[in-house]
Amino acid sequence: MQKAELITAIVTPFNDRDEIDYGVMQRLVDHLIAEGTDGFVVGATTGEGPTLSHPEKITLYTRFADMVHGRALVIANSGSNNTKETAAFTHEVGGIAGIDATLVVVPYYNKPDQNGMIAHYTAVAAAAQKPIVIYNIPGRTGVDMLPATVATLAQNPMIQGIKQCGSLPALSDIIDRTKHDAFNVWTGEDAQALNIKTLGGMGVISVAAHLYAHSIREMYAALDRGDITTVAALQRQLLPKMAALFHFPSPAPTKAALNALGFQVGSPRLPLLPLNASQQQELAHLLGVPELSAIEAEVLA
């Protein structure tokens, strides 16, 4: 699996008929690659994967891989809380040309223990055609994969990374336990985009990169050259903006901002709602601009 340190968890654009808008998706992909994104997660949380049908996912993944055309890493969501279905779908998605890896979430609702998690991922890995990236997000699943469990699964050659959402101590522990070339650790928390690099991880799977990929790239470049003054300044600028994109249920804030920028990604599907006028104004305030369209000056500069 190719290396990627700034991965965008990309939204799924919908048109007025609530169908996937592939024209907008192509524009957004090209823009994000130009801004410094070197990877994508498609059809996952930010991409509203739970609202996509099986045929929609297969078509989306196939067309998305064609859009990227080898210019960036492509990780497609294939996980669920049903082991047999996850194994079958992971196998199917792995057969799509241009898909580099699959994202498999820790089973939600069922709430397995650590041994159950190991059994789940072992079964899915046995069916996989492409590398698997674990997705540990306790706030959405109700269970937390422990660092020791991650280390056990990292020994499986088909399991080559993790998107880890949670505390910094857990993130650091996972990095320390999985120090070998075939396993990549990404944070799924935008606010940890800097921390993950200083801890020796690969990078961030980001929502904020839709708007601030260039600034995150600039921060990473400053870190690489030891310019801590610039790193600190960029981190201070980015943190409140990153938090703002989760002030309302995600990805509604990101979609509202992208719509204001001219990327007509539409509304989220139910049960999520688009931001109303008052919420859009509040989001603009949190992003530090008088109205959402005003972010164009810093995002598209």
From Swiss-Prot:
**Coiled-coil region list:** none
User: Can you say where in the cell this protein is located?
Assistant: Cytoplasm
Enumerate the residues binding pyruvate: T46, I205
Q: Which residues cross the membrane?
A: none
Catalytic residues, chain numbering: Y135 (proton donor/acceptor), K163 (schiff-base intermediate with substrate)
Please list the GO terms describing molecular function.
4-hydroxy-tetrahydrodipicolinate synthase activity
One GO BP annotation is: lysine biosynthetic process via diaminopimelate
GO CC annotation, single: cytosol
Pfam families the UniProt entry points to:
DHDPS (PF00701)
> What is the protein's major site of localization?
cytoplasm
Note the SMART domains from the entry: DHDPS
Q: Which CDD domains match?
A: DHDPS
What are the UniProt keywords, alphabetically? Answer: Amino-acid biosynthesis, Cytoplasm, Diaminopimelate biosynthesis, Lyase, Lysine biosynthesis, Schiff base
Cytoplasm among keywords: yes
Annotated EC: 4.3.3.7
Residues the record annotates as the site (Part of a proton relay during catalysis) are: T45, Y109
Gene3D superfamilies in alphabetical order? Aldolase class I
Catalytic activity reads: L-aspartate 4-semialdehyde + pyruvate = (2S,4S)-4-hydroxy-2,3,4,5-tetrahydrodipicolinate + H2O + H(+)
Metabolic or biological pathway: Amino-acid biosynthesis; L-lysine biosynthesis via DAP pathway; (S)-tetrahydrodipicolinate from L-aspartate: step 3/4
Task performed by this protein: Catalyzes the condensation of (S)-aspartate-beta-semialdehyde [(S)-ASA] and pyruvate to 4-hydroxy-tetrahydrodipicolinate (HTPA).
User: HAMAP family under this entry?
Assistant: DapA
Protein family according to the UniProt entry: Belongs to the DapA family.
Q: How does it assemble?
A: Homotetramer; dimer of dimers.
What name does this protein carry? 4-hydroxy-tetrahydrodipicolinate synthase
Please give the organism: Lacticaseibacillus paracasei (strain ATCC 334 / BCRC 17002 / CCUG 31169 / CIP 107868 / KCTC 3260 / NRRL B-441)
